[in-house]
């Protein structure tokens, strides 16, 4: 498979990389400089807890091309919400999101969503997600969505609480019909390491069936390693490898994959690039 270092002629965007995680503390600055040299022109760092937001704002202000989003991930609800009093805390969460999202480097709301894989409270998860959707609607920002084993529930909420700017279904895994439903609601599909595994037939078929305009690339680093890199820290410099896998899967030129997915991301997140307007 083509490596990232060989793809200097193309520009890329990683729409989902947890670059603030401690996994990158030892080499973050050098790694970002290396990524920029190989053509990664922008990255979106999704927030998972409010405690992260100030640090993410500082990080993005200090480095060109880094952007972030603010959100409360369904797997981290317990870090912010009281199990008994959470209903009374929703307005505080909404206020915190509204305030934090005013930062110029904040380009989306999320990572938020539904996760029925974990032992969580679905009512609580739906209420928190609805809070995020309402904030995104008010601020006219896109949403970065997390979903595991809850697509029917998520689609129901997206239909009842529409978001004009749409967003991304991060790490999409599902059928072509499911993908089309999200795309019809204005949500792009996040394409990452999953497509590098031949056993992921359903997802690979879905990604092949959608128009390229519906797709954005992501690594989800340091998680979601590509095939052949299991057990290693995933890294944003593997975005070109994701792009190469997508080109092979769709039998399309790599240049078209890079150009269109980058354009999709720049337009969706309004990343202030002239060619995205």
Regions found by a protein language model. Name each.
Residues 1-277:
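Mid-domain alpha/beta scaffold segments of enzyme catalytic cores
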